[in-house]
Amino acid sequence: MSKLSRATRALRKPEAEGVIRTILRAGQAMPGPPLGPILGQRGVSINQFCKEFNEKTKDIKEGIPLPTKIFVKPDRTFEIKIGQPTVSYFLKAAAGIEKGARNTGKEVAGLVTLKHVYEIARVKAQDDAFALQDVPLSSVVRSIIGSARSLGIRVVKDLSSEELAAFQKERALFLAAQKEADLAAQAEAAKK
């Protein structure tokens, strides 16, 4: 490599523009990893981004995961586009669970009714992914049912409070047994 080509390579500025897609929790943007290094590579002021994001999401319940697009311009300014919460967040909230099933298809982590799915579909149908493609509501509902299945959430037609209470009691016992088995496996692994 000649001296001239090395000098030109050194003078070239790194590409500063582009789109960063991420999921950030409302009101909890911080300059640390993983967001800080990504924005820093593009020359964006991390503190300014965090202030602006937290200001835009101050009316939303803190901690809700929001799909976010960050458009970085050539002059290293940025524009933030915040989407609605993810389908998995809505499904887990409707089912009253924190995590999905470990073994989807074999265990059921929660129950939701078709009414819940329909309400989630009405909200998500306004999302860019569905609205730009003019997707019918029935397709959005099928997509959400597929997401529920992948989380281990069973979609039922009707659900009485007694059935829900019985399921939650059974699920709590299952999770306690699973936790005990995990602790026993960890203790066994520590002995080896």
From Swiss-Prot:
It comes from the Eukaryota. InterPro entries: Ribosomal_uL11, Ribosomal_uL11_bac-typ, Ribosomal_uL11_C, Ribosomal_uL11_C_sf, Ribosomal_uL11_N, Ribosomal_uL11_N_sf. It is found in: Mitochondrion. One of its GO terms (molecular function) is large ribosomal subunit rRNA binding. Disulfide bonds: none annotated. One of its GO terms (biological process) is translation. Gene3D superfamilies: Ribosomal protein L11, C-terminal domain, Ribosomal protein L11/L12, N-terminal domain. Component of the mitochondrial ribosome large subunit (39S) which comprises a 16S rRNA and about 50 distinct proteins. This is Large ribosomal subunit protein uL11m. It comes from Bos taurus. The gene is MRPL11.
